């Protein structure tokens, strides 16, 4: 089975690979900034970037099924949780270079993958129902406070972003404390979880 490289700073990875005429990027991201990065890479190196876009699960399935015949050189997706899960299947190879290590803080990279962007996990609130002073010093841990009973809506626990949030809390606060926190959040929910982020707001 072909192992592929997930690397956000592929400019650094491929900068000296002038023998490559093109590189195939399988991407689950959908941002104009990514396209601009590819264009800058091509302008600098002369290497053409072929982008195959799709949903994360579909791209992973395709790469896995194609095995050694996969055309993917680079796989880009959102969230370290997805990267960790795919890495656990042995689908990545060591992609670290001195340039990457110098540019990317250790907590934003692993041996086999590198982050290219950070995402803020923000909380939306209704100004009609929440007083600003209630949010003073607000943290994720604070969502378990009984004062929020019947006032919280959130996506399902099988959502990768929620799973990554919980993983970070386990890392920082420990499993026992995080379990207690999760029970507190569930007790404060206004309804059963459903829908995407937009559905929570509406």
Model-predicted segments: where are they?
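Extracytoplasmic ligand-binding site segments that recognize negatively charged/polar headgroups
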Residues: 28, 32, 71-199
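Early extracytoplasmic/lumenal segment of secretory-pathway proteins
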Residues: 20-85
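Solvent-exposed, well-ordered amphipathic alpha-helical segments
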Residues: 15, 46-52, 124, 128, ...
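Sec-dependent N-terminal signal peptides
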Residues: 4-14
